[in-house]
Amino acid sequence: MRYPNLLFLALPISEHYIEESLKYFKLTSNDPMILSGFRGPRVSHLTIGMIPVKNDEDVLKCMDFLYNKEDEIRKSYGEKKITIDLKGTSFFGKSPQEAKVLYATPVDKHNEWLKVIFTEHNLFTKDARPLTLHCTLLNSRYIKYQGRRIRFFNSEPFMEKYGQFLWAHNIELDKLSIMKTGAVGEPGNMYYEELASIPLLVND
């Protein structure tokens, strides 16, 4: 890993929950250029926060913190399975016409406190904005036009078409992970490398 770098804390989404919806998304979208940035279902996750690291020591520090907080985090979730739905779309960017990210929106949002405990220990990048849990569908950094990455794209057609679309129902969130930024693998079947994770529910 090169330094400085970024890691991220996330709730991974198992690909079987969302792969059929993403196949439909690809088949029914009408913009080949935009869809060139599609990375596949294996990258699906809910981002909680970004973790800057300058060296191996920083990486070990954030991994140890996650492991040390395992009991506290698991206790806060209780003994029931943690499930969410993904419905509709939204964007990050200056405007819908200048979107950098198109994402599916989780119906249940209850993880702001996770961002707080990591921020309090100076592990996250400073960000005063409230947590926006999201599952990225398209990101401008992966979309190319005439061999060059685009800066933004028009998300309006996607939000009109998939604004009420149910991407996945009863997704079980079973672990919390620290991952490397920068998906790897073949186009359409990319994934993020996991550095550390803790289970959110212990099976008897």
Curated annotation (Swiss-Prot):
Looking at the UniProt record for this protein, which Gene Ontology cellular component terms does it annotate, in alphabetical order?
cytoplasm; cytosol; nucleus
Q: Which domain of life is it from?
A: Eukaryota
Descriptive protein name: Uncharacterized protein C15D4.13c
The keyword Nucleus is annotated on this UniProt entry: yes
**What GO biological process term is on the record, naming one?**
ribosome disassembly
Per UniProt, the keywords (alphabetical) are:
Cytoplasm, Nucleus
**Location relative to the cell:** Cytoplasm; Nucleus
Q: Does the keyword Nucleotide-binding apply?
A: no
PANTHER family per UniProt: ACTIVATING SIGNAL COINTEGRATOR 1 COMPLEX SUBUNIT 1
Please give the InterPro entries that the UniProt record associates with this protein. AKAP7-like_phosphoesterase, ASCC1
Q: List the disulfide bonds.
A: none
